[in-house]
Regions:
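Well-ordered, non-transmembrane segments within structured domains
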Residues: 2-3, 15, 104, 120
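Bacterial N-terminal signal peptides
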Residues: 8-18
Length: 163
């Protein structure tokens, strides 16, 4: 007589992962407006550099990192971050501009642009849909993790509104 393995697998799966027909965990909603903090930990890889005359250059860099919310709130926490950045230096004067996509554990994301002072929310998905606001930041430079790489810790103070 053949015995089916399915009942045993279902029991083992239930014990390991919870109820087969269990209640899905509720996704934490973002309040309609607020202020909080998050810190991003970045590794930076300059992709292209063009050196020009008279202390001038342009650099395109890719930033990869994660965020943590030190206030213990569930939003803007454990997000993976992917950014592109341009750094322009003209006769020693530097400015920068970039854009990022931050995605949380639920798959919800924010999109931002940034300059040397703050990130600016241009929208999002899921709990971040309709987000506007800004996140001024400071930069702590870490030792380089390897040749041609940089690393930073960037604390942000974010103020947002859902529209």
């Amino acid at each position: 007589m053949k015995r089916s393995l399915l009942p045993g697998l279902l029991v083992a799966g239930t014990l390991a992962f919870g109820s087969v027909g269990g209640v899905a965990q509720e996704v934490e909603k973002l309040p309609p407006s607020g202020t909080t903090h998050f810190t991003t930990y970045f590794s930076v890889h300059p992709a292209h550099v063009v050196e020009m005359v008279e202390d001038s250059s342009i650099t395109v860099a890719e930033l990869i990192g994660i965020t943590r919310n030190p206030d213990g709130e569930p939003y803007f926490d454990s997000m993976v971050v992917h950014c592109l950045l341009t750094i322009r230096v003209v006769k020693g004067e530097q400015d920068l501009y970039g854009a990022c996509k931050e995605t949380d554990k639920d798959g919800d994301s924010t999109s931002t642009t940034f300059n040397s002072k703050a990130h600016y929310f241009i929208g999002g998905t899921g709990k971040y849909k309709g987000i506007t606001g800004e996140a001024p930041f400071t930069v702590e430079i870490l030792p380089a993790p390897g040749e041609g790489l940089s690393a930073f810790i960037i604390p942000h103070e974010v103020t947002w509104k859902l529209e």
